[in-house]
């Protein structure tokens, strides 16, 4: 869902 995509997006944006 959108929640999973959200955490994924933030994860990539953080560069982790």
UniProtKB/Swiss-Prot annotation:
<keyword id="KW-0378">Hydrolase</keyword>
<comment type="similarity">
    <text>Belongs to the glycosyl hydrolase 19 family. Chitinase class I subfamily.</text>
</comment>
<dbReference type="InterPro" id="IPR023346">
    <property type="entry name" value="Lysozyme-like_dom_sf"/>
</dbReference>
<keyword id="KW-0326">Glycosidase</keyword>
<keyword id="KW-0146">Chitin degradation</keyword>
<protein>
    <recommendedName>
        <fullName>Endochitinase 1</fullName>
        <ecNumber>3.2.1.14</ecNumber>
    </recommendedName>
</protein>
<keyword id="KW-0611">Plant defense</keyword>
<keyword id="KW-0624">Polysaccharide degradation</keyword>
<dbReference type="GO" id="GO:0006032">
    <property type="term" value="P:chitin catabolic process"/>
</dbReference>
<keyword id="KW-0119">Carbohydrate metabolism</keyword>
<dbReference type="GO" id="GO:0006952">
    <property type="term" value="P:defense response"/>
</dbReference>
<dbReference type="GO" id="GO:0008843">
    <property type="term" value="F:endochitinase activity"/>
</dbReference>
<comment type="function">
    <text>Defense against chitin-containing fungal pathogens.</text>
</comment>
<dbReference type="GO" id="GO:0000272">
    <property type="term" value="P:polysaccharide catabolic process"/>
</dbReference>
